[in-house]
Amino acid sequence: MSSEQREGSQETTTTTVEGNGTIAGQNSHSAAPTTLRATSTMVSCQRLRLNPNNEHRPDSYEDLQLDFPNSVYSSLEKYLPPNMLVSNRDEKIKFMTDIMLRHLPHGERSRAQRHSDYRLKITTNYQPLHKELYTLVPTVCFVPAFLKAINENTEESFRNIISEPSPGVFVFDMLQPSFCEMMLAEIDNFERWVGETKFRIMRPNTMNKYGAVLDDFGLDTMLDKLMEGFIRPISKVFFSDVGGATLDSHHGFVVEYGKDRDVDLGFHVDDSEVTLNVCLGNQFVGGELFFRGTRCEKHVNTATKADETYDYCHIPGQAVLHRGRHRHGARATTCGHRVNMLLWCRSSVFRELKTHHKDFSSWCGECFCEKRDEKVRSIDALRKKLFKPRQTQA
């Protein structure tokens, strides 16, 4: 079967790829490791504020391994009752953790605890090769032009470094070659440790059989900083319609393609609001990303329109940023070995709002066409009504 035929067959049914480095279907906010556990005796009758106290400056939680993403604690702190705002950090953590755990079904709590134990086994036994990777140093990670655009933090500065070769697909140079090399070496070191210890690791998602979850071996804090300080400002400008301004959790991982690895990736959508995909390198042939339009859940398997077709060729250090609901896949890597780092960025606010909406025409290509066609029909009907010819009497 040719690559074109294979791609055509893949487009008949679009898969939603789930992945938190956990059991499929796990809540996206329950995947982070735990060092502090809230007990059932900690239940408080105090209620959260209905509106955030935006004048309050939250504590930093970046130095801790917690039940939920560090950024969730910083965001939730603004909703704490007044007497809790003046409490010490440990008391606030216990209070917030208990609230969030109480809203998890019992099965989810058990899965979260098992995954916490799994991560703890890794972080207490795995010895990092490049410890500098675990704290985000912008000048070490990013190319100067990208840093300059982030520091200026305007739409104009972003557009100066970003191209949009197809609607909703944004491409820009991002990572330093030296950083990519360190990441590749760290991944090799992790896989070597896995092989030597025969430790069974969880794969990134439900489609990739190879690769690793970066959050599981200690890079979650670094990736949180990457999302909050560098991806969210860009997403606020280009993906405001899918919660780009309110990204508050992530799933970070690497995937590997080539000989003795995954070969290609079928047509799918991601479990994210915004996806960052960066090629880390190694020599390879093939592996192009093919994009086929953004769709809501209702229209995920509808036909692709001519202007929605785009193929992207990977370049080491170059980033691709797109909506998670942008349908895509990866063609076969026919030679060599390709490694990509992905960050699925999620917004709990957008996910909650989405449950109350049916019109996604601002980002779903099919919803947009349906709304446009309905508008045309309404105008035609009104025109016929207003300009209905008068009947002459005999």
UniProtKB/Swiss-Prot annotation:
Signal peptide: none annotated. Keywords: Dioxygenase, Iron, Metal-binding, Nucleus, Oxidoreductase, Vitamin C. InterPro entries: Oxoglu/Fe-dep_dioxygenase_dom, Pro_4_hyd_alph. Residues 1-35 are annotated as: Disordered. It is found in: Nucleus, Nucleoplasm. Binds 1 Fe(2+) ion per subunit. Disruption phenotype: No visible phenotype under normal growth conditions. The double mutant seedlings icu11 and cp2 skip the vegetative phase, flower immediately after germination and then die. It comes from the Eukaryota. Its EC number is 1.14.11.-. Fe cation binds at H268, D270, H328. Its cofactor is Fe(2+); L-ascorbate. It is an enzyme of class 1 (oxidoreductase). Expressed in roots, cotyledons, rosette leaves, cauline leaves, inflorescences and siliques. The keyword Amino-acid biosynthesis does not apply. One of its GO terms (molecular function) is dioxygenase activity. 2-oxoglutarate binds at R338. Participates in the epigenetic repression of flowering genes in association with ICU11. Functions in the repression of several members of the MADS-box transcription factors family, including SEP3, during vegetative development via histone modification. PANTHER family: 2-OXOGLUTARATE AND IRON-DEPENDENT OXYGENASE DOMAIN-CONTAINING PROTEIN 2. This is 2-oxoglutarate and iron-dependent oxygenase domain-containing protein CP2.
